[in-house]
Structure formats: C-alpha cells, structure tokens
Swiss-Prot record:
Entry keyword Acyltransferase: no
UniProt name for this protein: Floral homeotic protein APETALA 1
Biological role: Transcription factor that promotes early floral meristem identity in synergy with LEAFY. Displays a redundant function with CAULIFLOWER in the up-regulation of LEAFY. Required subsequently for the transition of an inflorescence meristem into a floral meristem, and for the normal development of sepals and petals in flowers. Regulates positively B class homeotic proteins.
Pfam families: K-box, SRF-TF
Gene name of the encoded protein: AP1
Residues covered by region (Disordered): 184-206
Family annotation (PROSITE patterns): K_BOX (PS51297), MADS_BOX_1 (PS00350), MADS_BOX_2 (PS50066)
Residues annotated as domain K-box: 88-178
Annotated keywords: Activator, Coiled coil, Developmental protein, Differentiation, DNA-binding, Flowering, Nucleus, Transcription, Transcription regulation
Boundaries of every MADS-box domain copy: 1-61
One annotated GO molecular function: protein heterodimerization activity
Length: 256
C-alpha cells in the first residue's frame, strides 16, 4: 500500500513547529551546500524564523557578493521592462536595497566584534572564525612587513654611520702621520745643524731714526779679524768730539 500525500499546513503545536523548523532548516542548509559543491554553483540562502532570528548560508562566505550580483541583475532586468511611470517605484526599491545592505553590514560588524552570536548556527560560527583568522593573517603579515622594512632602514643608517666613522678615522690617522713626519724631519735638521727652531713671526716695529743711525757697524781690526764696533764706544767718541771744541773755546777766553 502506497504512502499517502502529506498535506502541508501550519503546525499548531509550538514545540512540534520548532522541532520541525530546526530539522527542515538543517536539511535545507545541507541541500544548499550539496548543490553548491556538486554543481559548482553560487548559492545564497536566507531564512528567518517566526521569532525573527536570521539563518543564512552562502557559498564560500560571500553572501554580500551574491546579493550584490542579484541586485544588479534584478535592477537591470527591471530597467529593461519597466515603463517610465515606474521610476519612483524603482527608487523606492533601490532605497530598500541599500537599507537592507546597511543592516547586513551592521550585523556583520557586530559579529566581528563578538556581539549578537546567539542566533548563529555552528556553520555560521565556523565561517566567522575563518574570516577572523584570515583577517588576523593579513594583519600579522602587514605588521611583519612594516617591522622588516623598519629594520632594513635602521641597518642601512647604521652602515652609513660606520662608513662615515671609518672615513673620519682614516683622515685623522693620515693627518697624524703627516705631522709626525714633519716633526721627525725638523728634529733631524736641528740635530745636524745644532740650530734652534725658527722663532715665531713677529710684527714689524717702527724704530726711531736715531736708533737706525746708531746700529753697530762692523770694522776691520789690525789683526785681520772682522769685528763689530761697540755702540757704547761709538757714543763715547761722539761725545768727546762734541765736547772738545767747547773746552778749547773756554780756555781761549780765559787766556785772553
């Protein structure tokens, strides 16, 4: 005897209705997953319970992409078949579409913050965990890249400073070598000629003409030695020559 056709109608018992909803929802999600895997199809499933809880499934967790694709396709089809009188209606639908998209983004944001997770199924929680893990991997990769670039920059600066220090040290050593060679050459010259080091340059002083005229002058001695005349002796001779006529003049006056 064949099985009779079951009549579809609302289940009056709340407990039975909730149990049936849970079983059928799980079966529906399973069928959506099977068709997406077997047929390589993009599937998006959205279910609201009688209490307003949302249950969804999407291929590879790309619900937003599938909905945007659906909206673009539906909007393009409506634009082709809709008359000009339906422009206001289209704007109203566009508003509702954007509003629904905003609500979806806000809900995803709450999920990313760890809020409002009670209404999510184990599959949805697993998808959310995968998304967070992927985001953490991207964050760690970017952080490591910035740290690596910072380390390379510091190493480059360190190398430049070391090269500059080496160049300055080499210049100092060369300068010390030159000064040491000059000092040794000067010491050898002083040792060979027994001469003191040259005095430092002095400023020229202006001398009185009298001092210039009474500089010691050389004279030739009878012995053949070249000597310089004593300036005091020259001064004394000049005084004697100057006083002798005066003394003679006085003697002549007394004699008269």
């Amino acid at each position: 005897m064949g099985r009779g056709r079951v009549q579809l109608k609302r289940i009056e018992n709340k407990i039975n209705r909730q149990v049936t909803f849970s079983k059928r929802r799980a079966g529906l999600l399973k069928k959506a997953h099977e068709i997406s895997v077997l047929c390589d199809a993009e599937v998006a499933l959205v279910v609201f319970s009688h209490k307003g809880k949302l249950f969804e499934y999407s291929t590879d967790s790309c619900m937003e992409k599938i909905l945007e694709r659906y909206e673009r396709y539906s909007y393009a089809e409506r634009q082709l078949i809709a008359p000009e009188s339906d422009v206001n209606t289209n704007w109203s639908m566009e508003y509702n579409r954007l509003k629904a998209k905003i609500e979806l983004l806000e809900r995803n944001q709450r999920h990313y913050l760890g809020e409002d997770l009670n209404a999510m199924s184990p599959k949805e929680l697993q998808n959310l965990e995968q998304q967070l893990d992927t985001a953490l991997k991207h964050i760690r990769t970017r952080k490591n890249q910035l740290m690596y670039e910072s380390i390379n920059e510091l190493q480059r600066k360190e190398k430049a400073i070391q090269e500059q220090n080496s160049m300055l040290s080499k210049q100092i050593k060369e300068r010390e070598k030159i000064l040491r060679a000059q000092q040794e050459q000067w010491d050898q010259q002083n040792h060979g000629h027994n001469m003191p080091p040259p005095p430092p340059p002095q400023q020229h002083q202006i001398q009185h003409p009298y001092m210039l005229s009474h500089q010691p002058s050389p004279f030739l001695n009878m012995g053949g030695l070249y000597q310089e005349e004593d300036p005091m002796a020259m001064r004394r001779n000049e005084l004697e020559l100057t006083l002798e006529p005066v003394y003679n003049c006085n003697l002549g006056c007394f004699a008269a």
